[in-house]
Regions:
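Acidic, metal/ion-coordinating pockets
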Residues: 3, 7-18, 33-356, 401-408, ...
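C-terminal segment of classical bacterial N-terminal signal peptides
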Residues: 22-29
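Feature captures C-terminal
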Residues: 46-54, 64, 77, 84, ...
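Short, solvent-exposed loop/turn motifs
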Residues: 206-208, 390, 513, 535
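N-terminal accessory/precursor segments of enzymes
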Residues: 213-225, 347-351, 368, 372, ...
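Alpha-helical structural context
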Residues: 286-287, 388, 412, 416
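Acidic, Ser/Thr/Pro-rich beta/coil linker or hinge segments at domain junctions
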Residues: 358-362, 384-385
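Glycine-rich phosphate/diphosphate-binding loops and the adjacent beta-loop-alpha structural elements
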Residues: 380-398
Length: 607
């Protein structure tokens, strides 16, 4: 479904801004050129005329509209004193507009908008926006009310499928940009690649600003089930090199890139794709003609990063606001009118903190009913727990709460394969310690408790693996631990995340027994690997229950992405856990806990 241009252009006209918008497949970029040529056709005024533009940016909102923790059922708080949510950042945005003059500001986002909280899950799956006479997505409501100008697509926009994304797009009063999200057959943009807007400069030609939106190539892996054969996601660098010159030729005085891509120049998916995952700094270095880049995806806080372009020697300014609307990036751009055209004289970036202001009552009132509906949903009781289960030490000790995930996955896969040629094969399962703070308290168990355990909307896949492949899989997973010599002090805060690997890329594997010797170098850590009490047979076949992220190559674990797929489903693993607990009625570790692995040093247990 293309962008609703009538609604978008009507909004632009109401603010007095002329807009050239390219990118819907039906409208080639060349058609937008006449709209931009008006700048060149105006009579130049006095050289030295100046104009100040402020571009505001958020990123990785992940469905956070209020400063509320749905998993804790209360106001969000952390040790750093952060505050979250669009209602909070809306107040910051209003402050900036009053300071700078709304007519001199632009508001952007760098993606990952419609996934990440029970709120976004609810309006994708429980009361879906795609239903006949379905609701308006709360993120669309909030961002429309705040007045976003353009938003880049994030990879999590595709988590619920293209139909949900297109419906969200239809509900937005702003374009969803993705120059490198192209139709598989035609290789033409499937979403608007860019957005252009003119700003009135008294006594001089208008200032034309172009925003190029770029999403993440990893979507081809992470949401393969939804996009394969429909959409392709080429590299950010090559697409920026294609589009930035076009935008300049169309009269853009300022070019901003909104990129759902970090700055590290690395990829979590290894060499599975020829495109870099975190390529924002690469774009700045390699592609001439960019003034600033709003960075997303990495969930890092970068007030200002200056990168020198290799070809022009000019400095490009990058900024990444902290996720969940905890920060607002500001790019202050100074222009001077010289020889009949606007030139960027300077760009600086800074951050504003959402914890310095109160919620915007306009947004609170707008979304209070939808928020209340979700709070009611997540507090439904589904069972009783005999003891408290927690992930506090699940990174370095085999924790029953993670065993619960694996037990559910094993049971679902066994039932799915019953009566097939694979029914007799042993089933093993992988699960990761997603959260360090998840807790299922003794007593009543709610959907909220289980959602805090499994925070992602992953689904279940069954893969055919050999013993040798599982051994390699475990060795790769064990690289998560920092090598620690026997006798050295063990600091659990420094024991994990070696090489920057996140917790979600460390896997337990149930059904096998093994030691991880952290005194050994990476690649030689798995010891005493057994199955049913005997040494693992490298040739034996297993069914491995994995989440779809891992099955598609997420985390670059060996063999699993290329392994034969035996079965898959669209029901979320979180839902399967809730169903399992509901059916049991009682959550008792004796029904799922098993000691499968432990950390050792030269054979001696660490704990």
């Amino acid at each position: 479904m293309p962008l609703n241009r009538r609604k978008f252009l009507s909004k632009s006209a109401a603010t007095g801004a002329g807009v050239a918008l390219a990118g819907a497949v039906a409208a080639p970029a060349a058609q937008a050129a006449p709209a931009a040529s008006a700048t060149a056709g105006q009579k130049p005024e006095n050289p030295g005329k100046r104009y100040s533009l402020t571009v505001m940016g958020t990123t990785d909102l992940h469905g956070h509209v209020f400063n509320w923790d749905y998993f804790k059922d209360g106001e969000y708080s952390d040790a750093a004193g952060n505050a979250q949510g669009l209602a909070r950042v809306s107040t910051l945005i209003d402050q900036v507009r009053k300071e700078k003059g709304r007519e001199n500001t632009l508001l952007l986002d760098a993606g990952d908008t419609i996934q990440g909280t029970p709120l976004t899950y609810y309006y994708a799956k429980v009361d879906p926006i795609t239903a006949k006479r379905g609701p308006v997505h709360p993120m669309a409501k909030a961002m429309n009310a705040i007045g976003y100008d353009a938003v880049a697509l994030g990879n999590h926009e595709f988590n619920y499928g293209i139909e949900t994304l297109r419906k969200f797009e239809e509900q937005c009063d702003f374009p969803l940009l993705g120059a490198n999200a192209v139709d598989h057959k035609t290789q033409k943009p499937a979403f608007p690649p860019y957005f252009m807007k003119k700003f009135h400069a008294p006594g001089a030609a208008p200032v034309t600003v172009a925003v190029l939106g770029l999403t993440n190539p990893g979507i081809a892996i992470w949401d393969k089930a939804y996009v394969q054969g429909k959409l392709d996601f080429p590299g950010l660098e090559e697409q920026a090199a294609k589009w930035v010159p076009k935008l300049r030729s169309m009269g853009a005085d300022v070019v901003i890139v909104s990129a759902h891509s970090g700055t590290s120049g690395t990829s979590s998916y290894g060499d599975q794709l020829p495109y870099v995952e975190d390529a924002a700094a690469n774009i700045a270095r390699q592609v001439p003609g960019i003034d600033a880049i709003l960075v997303g995806h990495a969930h890092k806080e970068i007030a200002e990063l200056k990168v020198v372009n290799d070809k022009t020697g000019k400095t490009v300014v990058l900024s990444e606001p902290l996720c969940y609307a905890e920060r607002l990036s500001l790019f202050d751009i100074e222009l001077v009118f010289v020889k009949g055209q606007w030139e960027v004289e300077s760009v600086s970036a800074s951050l504003r903190n959402a914890n310095t202001v109160a919620d915007d009552p306009k947004i609170t009132k707008l979304l209070s009913d939808q928020h209340a509906e979700v709070v009611k949903y997540v507090n439904q009781v589904v069972g009783q727990a005999t003891v408290t289960l927690t992930t506090v030490d699940a990174r370095y000790k085999d924790a029953p709460i993670i065993d619960l995930i694996n037990k559910v996955q094993e049971d679902v896969v066994k039932a799915a394969l019953a009566g097939t040629q694979y029914a007799a094969l042993p089933v093993v399962s992988q699960a990761s310690p997603f959260s360090r703070t998840s807790e299922i308290p003794a007593g009543k168990v709610t959907i909220r408790d289980l959602s805090s355990l499994y925070v992602y909307d992953n689904t279940l896949v069954a893969k055919l693996m050999t013993g040798a492949q599982l051994r390699a899989y475990l060795e790769y997973s064990a690289e998560y631990f920092v090598q620690t010599a026997a006798g050295a002090t063990v600091d659990v805060n420094k024991l994990t995340n070696a090489g920057g690997r996140p917790d979600y890329n460390y896997d337990y594997v149930s059904g096998l027994q093994y030691d991880i010797d952290i005194a050994q170098p990476a690649g030689s850590r798995i010891k005493n690997l057994t199955f049913n009490g005997a040494a693992l047979d490298d040739a034996q076949e297993f069914v491995m229950a994995v989440n779809n992220y891992r099955a598609n190559g997420g985390g670059a674990f060996p063999h699993v992405a290329s392994a034969k797929e035996l079965w898959a489903e669209s029901t979320e693993i979180r839902t399967r856990i809730a169903e399992w607990v509901t059916a049991k009625g009682v959550l008792d570790p004796k029904d799922f806990a098993s000691l499968d692995w432990k950390l050792t040093r030269n054979g001696t247990p660490v704990f």
